[in-house]
């Protein structure tokens, strides 16, 4: 993506995998609902600085990929270095869908092997080519370099985020077949994983406070959002709220009630004024129950105005039509005569504004496994102005606008109903074979931990 505004070029989801100057990817963990070989091959090349052919020749796993079992297997020859790991028992999985989209990447310096960096990415979009080409999505990221652990103030919160991500991936590792990662050192890269583990533990020892990153293994996403807003000692009643989601409750269930629930709860916690301005951003071509709820939402107190999501020109100057897929809440105070977003906070994550995505804890038949962050951005402005950096303008950072709404008479489409797909990729009896040399040749043996 290119932008002429102040020379600012927003980072694409694939570019978040780029190794920093002087570094190369050591090992990484990625989870999500879906991924494809095209995206993951690009991500692995950016991460390792090796081409597809070079990675195939090296034969080493650099990224462990956990996806919903409905995602077809991504074969190692199609994305060398990426091990798409199958779930152990799809029928007993502790979530409706694996929907959390998180990456934890570790890089080692090319010359000074004592220097390293950890990167955490939280995305609203899937790890697919479609996300890059057709969707409106957002991502949040932090980088922690090894030098930062040596007495730098303010590193505790970022380290707490790493701790939360590590806990999630450790939990997933117990529920997916990781035998391939235990293959011989050339393939499974156990040495790389062990050195990265020491880096993560070094961060965990510096962790302080409540992490911005959270998931819904214990309680629903919305409960986690509210708890963080209250615990952060920032109980301020804002007068603006923007909500956005790529998916809502099915139209067959009647008018949408979850947007009203969000507003009601924020008001009751004194995080939103009773006379606030509230916008709900949707994909007009597929907004499920919102398509039949515009009048009812507008009649609510405070009124909830349904608006089509915007494509930030700074991010998409080509103006190609994209469908909203991002899930977000953004709230701040707006003051007459000021362009500053006062007391802002934002939720970004995988959880759609649905019952399974936002109001339920993860469970086999009720809640998806979701993950997100609550952040308090500093220096954010409402609109583009002269001398205001483009990366500080909220309409460049989120797909929101205030010029157009979906008036009750405007035609909105609910789109096709969606139901969880059948599981396809489950752990086989044998995960891999090892080649054992003999003086007269060799033989294939089932990998360690496999059973015939």
Model-derived segments and their meaning:
Residues 1-452:
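PLD/PLD-like phosphodiesterase catalytic module centered on the HKD motif
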């Amino acid at each position: 993506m290119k932008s002429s505004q102040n020379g600012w070029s927003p980072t694409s989801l694939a570019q978040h995998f780029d190794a920093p100057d002087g570094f190369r990817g050591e090992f990484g963990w990625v989870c999500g609902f879906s991924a494809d070989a095209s995206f993951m091959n690009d991500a692995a090349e950016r991460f390792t600085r090796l081409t597809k052919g070079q990675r195939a020749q090296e034969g080493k796993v650099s990224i462990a990929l956990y996806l919903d079992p409905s995602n077809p297997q991504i074969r190692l020859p199609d994305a060398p270095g990426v091990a798409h790991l199958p779930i152990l028992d799809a029928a007993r999985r502790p979530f409706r869908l694996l929907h959390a989209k998180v990456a934890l990447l570790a890089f080692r310096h090319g010359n000074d092997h004592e220097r390293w960096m950890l990167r955490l990415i939280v995305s609203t979009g899937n790890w697919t080519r479609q996300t890059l080409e057709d969707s409106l999505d957002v991502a949040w990221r932090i980088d922690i370099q090894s030098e930062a652990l040596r007495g730098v103030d303010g590193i505790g919160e970022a380290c707490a985020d790493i701790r939360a991500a590590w806990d999630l991936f450790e939990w997933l590792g117990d529920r997916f077949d990781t035998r391939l990662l235990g293959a011989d050192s050339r393939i499974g890269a156990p040495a790389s994983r062990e050195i990265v583990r020491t880096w993560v533990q070094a961060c965990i020892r510096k962790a302080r406070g409540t992490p911005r990153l959270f998931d819904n293994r214990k309680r629903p996403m919305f409960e986690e959002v509210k708890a963080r807003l209250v615990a952060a000692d920032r109980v301020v009643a804002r007068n603006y709220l923007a909500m956005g989601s790529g998916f809502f409750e099915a139209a067959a269930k009647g008018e949408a009630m979850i947007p009203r629930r969000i507003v009601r709860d924020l008001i009751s916690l004194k995080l939103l004024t009773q006379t606030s301005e509230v916008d709900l951003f949707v994909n007009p071509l597929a907004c499920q129950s919102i398509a039949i709820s515009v009048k009812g939402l507008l009649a609510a107190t405070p009124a909830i105005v349904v608006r089509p999501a915007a494509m930030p020109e700074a991010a998409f100057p080509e103006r190609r039509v994209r469908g909203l897929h991002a899930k977000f809440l953004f709230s701040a105070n707006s003051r007459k005569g000021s362009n500053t977003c006062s007391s802002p906070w934002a939720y970004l994550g995988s959880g759609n504004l649905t019952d399974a995505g936002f109001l339920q804890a993860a469970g086999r038949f009720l809640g998806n496994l979701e993950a997100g962050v609550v952040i308090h951005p500093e220096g954010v402005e409402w609109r583009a102005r002269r001398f205001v950096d483009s990366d500080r303008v909220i309409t460049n950072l989120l797909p929101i606008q205030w010029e157009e709404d979906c008036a009750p008479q405007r035609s909105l489409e609910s789109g096709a109903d969606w139901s969880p797909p059948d599981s396809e990729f489950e752990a086989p009896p044998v995960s891999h074979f090892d080649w054992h040399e003999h003086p007269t040749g060799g033989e294939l043996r089932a990998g360690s931990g496999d059973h015939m």
